[in-house]
Amino acid sequence: QVLYGGKDLRRFGRKEFARLVSILPQTRDVPSIRAEQLVAHGRYPHLSFGRDLTQADREKIAWAMEVTGTTALKDKELSQLSGGERQRVYLAMTLSQDTDILFLDEPTTYLDIGQKYEMLELIGQVNAMGKTVVMVLHDLPLAFSYSHQVVVLEKGRLAAQGPADQVFASGVPARVFGVKSQ
């Protein structure tokens, strides 16, 4: 059970939930739209039926594209983008939604090693803005380097939870994932 303000998240309506939580799934469709149009989709939970984007919405979209380094891609079709560029555009959409909580499932998917570090630094900056970031990362060194708190699951059950350094030192991740830790 996950609570927000004492209320089970499953009890929120879709639009209400989307105003609180933005989600970046690991795999997504690639619609035939321009990058900026996709980023604008993050603003839809904040719009009334039939209402157009406001200047404030456009500013959030521009900000999200700027911080993710995707402004130069705004007029390109998603299908024309590399996997890494597309991943950053999807993160921009998630940021333009302007929620307090971000769920990111493997946000470094499709990124080369340099882009992975850039993405995680950016996510750290988002967290420093006061946003709660929950990430799924299977790259253990990255997970332990870029997370304040870590949860380790084993066969769907909680195996360890706590500050990253303490969970790492516990040896649980090494046992669960069958790797040696140093």
Regions of interest found by a model, annotated:
Residues D52, E77-L81, E85:
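Conserved ABC ATPase signature
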Residues Q1-K7, F17:
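Conserved ABC transporter NBD signature motif
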Residues L137-H138:
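H-loop/switch region of ABC-family ATPase nucleotide-binding domains
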Residues L102-E106:
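Catalytic Walker B motif of ABC-type/P-loop ATPase nucleotide-binding domains
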Residues A143-S145:
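A short, surface-exposed alpha-helical micro-motif characterized by mixed small hydrophobic
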Residues A40, Q55-L73, D98:
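Conserved ABC ATPase "signature" region
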